[in-house]
Structures are given as C-alpha cells and as structure tokens.
C-alpha cells in the first residue's frame, strides 16, 4: 500500500500547480451539469482579466467572453459534449473583461457514466503570444 502524502506535501504540490498554471498561462475549469455549477481556477480568472473569485461564472457568461463570431462554435462544443459525450479542442478568439482581444485554446473532456454526461472538465490556455 502506498503511503499517503503529508499535509505539507499536499500544500507544496498545490502551490507548485498554481505557479505552473501562472507560468504556462493555462487555467482549469469544471462544470457539473446536474447542479448547473461552473468552477474556474484562479488562472482562468486571470486570463479573462478578472480578479480571482470576484464573480461566479456560469456557462452562459463564459460563452459570452468569446468573440461574437466564436460564441456559436463554443456553445455547439458544449452542447455536443453534454448531449453526446464528445470532447473538443479548439482555438478561438476571446474578449477579456477589459476589452482586450486574445486567442485561447480551450479543451473540454466529458465524464460519461451510463451514457450520460455527469461532468465536464478542461483547460483554457492563452495562446496569443505563442
């Protein structure tokens, strides 16, 4: 049996993950379709130029950050994942809360149990300078 990590090791790993996310400019998100709740990591807030945890994100508000010409594509990817369990990997323009246009790579992966999507999780990466 593997030993469990100490609280200090867990705290160190969490801090390292936060630092790596900031360095790579990549954030994570998770959506619970049953509760209709969306969670963003600190870095997603930073990518969209909001103070971390200053707003409670929703799917609708998240899609609203994409450039107008990209919103239908993002909404379709979400709907297809929720209804058919299909993952996506897209590069789309996004308009931050401060009005700056950037490009992001957004990846979504559904968790399907008994043919039903019970959770979506993924990443948002600012690829503007890449």
Please provide the spans of the model-predicted regions.
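Short acidic/glycine-rich beta-turn/loop cap or linker motifs at sensory/regulatory domain boundaries
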Residues: 29-39
């Amino acid at each position: 049996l593997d030993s469990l990590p100490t609280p200090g090791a867990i705290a160190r790993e969490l801090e390292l993950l936060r630092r790596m996310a900031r360095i790579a400019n990549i954030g994570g998100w998770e959506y619970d379709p049953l509760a209709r709740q969306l969670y963003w990591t600190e870095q997603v807030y930073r990518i969209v130029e909001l103070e971390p945890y200053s707003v409670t994100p929703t799917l609708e508000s998240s899609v609203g950050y994409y450039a107008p010409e990209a919103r239908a594509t993002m909404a379709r990817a979400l709907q297809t994942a929720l209804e058919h369990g299909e993952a996506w990997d897209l590069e789309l323009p996004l308009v931050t809360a401060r009005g700056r246009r950037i490009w992001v790579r957004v990846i979504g992966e559904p968790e399907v149990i008994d043919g039903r999507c019970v959770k979506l999780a993924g990443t948002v990466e600012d690829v503007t300078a890449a």
